């Protein structure tokens, strides 16, 4: 699964209403008119420019993690990646890819979340560059 880097997010942004209720997928809530506060998508997605950027997913190797083809991901370059986190990384100067980072007992690999794709084992001498940790993913549901 490769990614297309879209660039950093801007500072600031438009504030949207945040309702103080969870949205059920069944019956509507009687609290639909209660606004808790206004927040920006930057605040909700923990965007802290300039080290956070958006990337577009290409492919289906991360569907088991809920990340699908053409989703947008919010990537934080300031975080140190830990075992089990989803990262954007480049292996041996290749194009960046989105995978789950596996680091345990001296084994390091970039793991797909789709059994149709093999994991990429990091071997001695390989050059692994972590471009950032994925904090959020976003998917368009409506028509463009």
Residue ranges and their predicted role:
Residues 70-71, 85:
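Structural motif
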Residues 110-112:
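SH3/SH3-like beta-barrel fold
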Residues 1-63, 96, 103-107, 118, ...:
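Short, positionally conserved secondary-structure boundary motifs
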Residues 74-75, 88:
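Hydrophobic beta-strand signal
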Residues 83-108:
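Short, compositionally biased
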Residues 114-121:
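Flexible, small-/acidic-enriched active-site or ligand-binding loops
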Residues 64-68:
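A short glycine-leucine-enriched loop at secondary-structure breakpoints
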């Amino acid at each position: 699964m490769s990614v297309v880097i879209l660039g950093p997010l801007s500072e600031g942004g438009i504030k949207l209403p945040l309702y103080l209720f969870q949205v059920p997928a069944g019956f509507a809530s009687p609290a639909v008119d209660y606004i808790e506060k206004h927040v920006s998508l930057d605040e909700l997605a923990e965007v802290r420019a300039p080290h956070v950027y958006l990337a577009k997913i290409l492919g289906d190797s991360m569907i088991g993690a809920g990340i699908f083809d053409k989703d947008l991901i919010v990537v934080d370059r300031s975080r140190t990646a830990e075992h089990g986190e989803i990262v954007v990384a480049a292996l041996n100067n290749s194009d960046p890819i989105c995978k789950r980072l596996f680091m345990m007992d001296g084994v390091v690999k970039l793991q797909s979340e789709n059994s149709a794709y093999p994991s990429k084992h990091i071997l001695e001498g390989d050059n692994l560059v972590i471009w950032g940790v994925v904090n959020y993913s976003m998917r368009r549901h409506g028509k463009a």
